[in-house]
Amino acid sequence: MRLATAANEAYTAPLAVSELLGCKQCGGGRDHDEELGIRIPRPLGQGPSRFIPEKEILQVGSEDAQMHALFADSFAALGRLDNITLVMVFHPQYLESFLKTQHYLLQMDGPLPLHYRHYIGIMAAARHQCSYLVNLHVNDFLHVGGDPKWLNGLENAPQKLQNLGELNKVLAHRPWLITKEHIEGLLKAEEHSWSLAELVHAVVLLTHYHSLASFTFGCGISPEIHCDGGHTFRPPSVSNYCICDITNGNHSVDEMPVNSAENVSVSDSFFEVEALMEKMRQLQECRDEEEASQEEMASRFEIEKRESMFVFSSDDDEVTPARDVSRHFEDTSYGYKDFSRHGMHVPTFRVQDYCWEDHGYSLVNRLYPDVGQLIDEKFHIAYNLTYNTMAMHKDVDTSMLRRAIWNYIHCMFGIRYDDYDYGEINQLLDRSFKVYIKTVVCTPEKVTKRMYESFWRQFKHSEKVHVNLLLIEARMQAELLYALRAITRYMT
């Protein structure tokens, strides 16, 4: 448990202890410090997300008793409530599983020492230029006794961690290229070799933070107050709210419209939702009437896989990584490339041959006990999570839509389900949504607020956060499948 030992350390947490216990006004003792001449940082920006109005997050967080308990547990474990946690407030069942899994990976007994875990988190987040996560884990790395020299660049870290850089690179951007030779190179590196258990722990951490970078960018997570870009020393503007309002129930605010795009007319919103629901009804009727042959199903997968290569955004420009992030990884020019372009041919990964439930789960649990179960629970919650709503409609079965989103992501990675009709994807996911999905999953550093607002314009922010949970868990599972299959092939 991390406890603040000095006044200035208390301010490094986005939510200080006094705030957690229910301060009624911003300050928590800060006014007294300002009288003493101490410069106190104030949040820069409007709430935990640049995409989601702060008032919506405040209202949800203050009305749910379960969230209060989760916040308290998270604060006790990490000494902070970060903005990712605050945005996940919309989905408490998932958040509980997420926090439990992350706590186990970072703090409970395991093959890797604590400072290695945070450094691997830094390496993984840096591949997507996610300074938000890098900054969080730099602080945690130092807190658990990590050597500050390692933070000057990957070349200053132990050779064992440097050797992990290649796997990190390929796993983050082109996981279909991972082979058993990558695994062998790490396990047989003489005095710098990894054990199988250590490697599985590292792989889980890498996939966790690659995916969390996707969530960070996909939801427009704002920098923490103690990080670069997250604070100012200027006097506050007139406002009645601070982050502590989440825990003390002080939310006497005007109701925010549930429509995430204010410029969309009510009639446009209505017809977009109705059109999507009608497509779902038609597809269900087609399922009941006829079933496509295996050959036709395979053909539709190949068509969707090829089409996914040509889904890109108009903002698809290269993003040059900043030095403070790029020093944590090598080969800065290496990034996502569609797996079938440039004459490359990669065999389709058939889930019937190697899947998480029958193969990956047991391998992880054998080498890193209990983690497989935690990850499996998180996958299932994200995949099955539903409130049976779509925008303004209730009592809607959204399973078809959730499956289309999950399988589209796996399709982009070359992963095929023999029992799924990939023709449904084009019926349910329009181009703007596909652009958002592909950007969040493959090049999250390029996500813009315009992309977030352009898909499902009539849906609530909570529903868009739900989409992001599906995206990150599907991505994590895809990466794990390729990495764990390579480990299995090495072992056999």
UniProtKB/Swiss-Prot annotation:
Alphabetic keyword roster? Cytoplasm, Nucleus, Oxidoreductase, Phosphoprotein
Q: Name one GO molecular function term.
A: L-leucine binding
| Residues with PTM Phosphoserine | S293, S314
The cross-references to InterPro entries, in alphabetical order and at most eight, read: AhpD-like (IPR029032), Sestrin (IPR006730)
Chain positions recorded as L-leucine binding sites: T386, Y387, N388, T389, T398, E463
The residues responsible for catalysis, as annotated, are: C130
Annotated region (N-terminal domain) at 71-252
- Predominant localisation class: nucleus
Signal peptide extent? none
Region: C-terminal domain, residue numbers: 321-492
GO CC annotations on file: cytoplasm; nucleus
Q: Which SUPFAM superfamilies match?
A: AhpD-like
Pfam families xref list: PA26
The organism's superkingdom is given as Eukaryota
Q: Which reaction does it catalyse?
A: a hydroperoxide + L-cysteinyl-[protein] = S-hydroxy-L-cysteinyl-[protein] + an alcohol
Cite a single GO BP annotation: cellular response to amino acid starvation
Q: Where would you find this protein in the cell? A: Nucleus; Cytoplasm
The EC number(s) attached to this protein equal 1.11.1.-
> Which comment does the entry carry about domains?
The N-terminal domain may have an alkylhydroperoxide reductase activity. The C-terminal domain mediates interaction with GATOR2 through which it regulates TORC1 signaling.
Q: Which PANTHER family match?
A: P53 REGULATED PA26 NUCLEAR PROTEIN SESTRIN, SESTRIN-1
- Reported function: Functions as an intracellular leucine sensor that negatively regulates the TORC1 signaling pathway through the GATOR complex. In absence of leucine, binds the GATOR subcomplex GATOR2 and prevents TORC1 signaling. Binding of leucine to SESN2 disrupts its interaction with GATOR2 thereby activating the TORC1 signaling pathway. This stress-inducible metabolic regulator may also play a role in protection against oxidative and genotoxic stresses.
Subunit info? Interacts with the GATOR2 complex which is composed of MIOS, SEC13, SEH1L, WDR24 and WDR59; the interaction is negatively regulated by leucine. Interacts with RRAGA, RRAGB, RRAGC and RRAGD; may function as a guanine nucleotide dissociation inhibitor for RRAGs and regulate them. Interacts with KEAP1, RBX1 and SQSTM1; in the SQSTM1-dependent autophagic degradation of KEAP1. May interact with PRDX1.
Q: Which family does it belong to?
A: Belongs to the sestrin family.
Q: What is this protein called?
A: Sestrin-1
Q: Which organism is it from?
A: Macaca fascicularis
Question: What gene name is listed for this protein?
Answer: SESN1
